[in-house]
UniProtKB/Swiss-Prot annotation:
The lineage of its organism: Bacteria, Bacillati, Cyanobacteriota, Cyanophyceae, Oscillatoriophycideae. It catalyses: reduced [plastocyanin] + hnu + oxidized [2Fe-2S]-[ferredoxin] = oxidized [plastocyanin] + reduced [2Fe-2S]-[ferredoxin]. HAMAP family: PSI_PsaC. It is an enzyme of class 1 (oxidoreductase). [4Fe-4S] cluster 2 binds at residues 21, 48, 51, 54. Residues 1-31, 39-68 form the 4Fe-4S ferredoxin-type domain. Binds 2 [4Fe-4S] clusters. Cluster 2 is most probably the spectroscopically characterized electron acceptor FA and cluster 1 is most probably FB. [4Fe-4S] cluster 1 binds at residues 11, 14, 17, 58. This is Photosystem I iron-sulfur center. PROSITE patterns: 4FE4S_FER_1, 4FE4S_FER_2.
Amino acid sequence: MSHSVKIYDTCIGCTQCVRACPLDVLEMVPWDGCKAAQIASSPRTEDCIGCKRCETACPTDFLSIRVYLGAETTRSMGLAY
């Protein structure tokens, strides 16, 4: 994934995305790459409805539904580039 370094470097561990998700798709997991020592993860991508509330809530533009869910899922949701 060509975006991973840029994306992971911008997460500040604020949990805004987790709180914004209406379906609890996201959760915070331990990660040493940021000050908060936690990062947003999406273990339940099959439950994502593509509402983009997580993207809107993110103050650093860390989240991208397209990056998290992959091409096949975003195509089926009509979100592909």
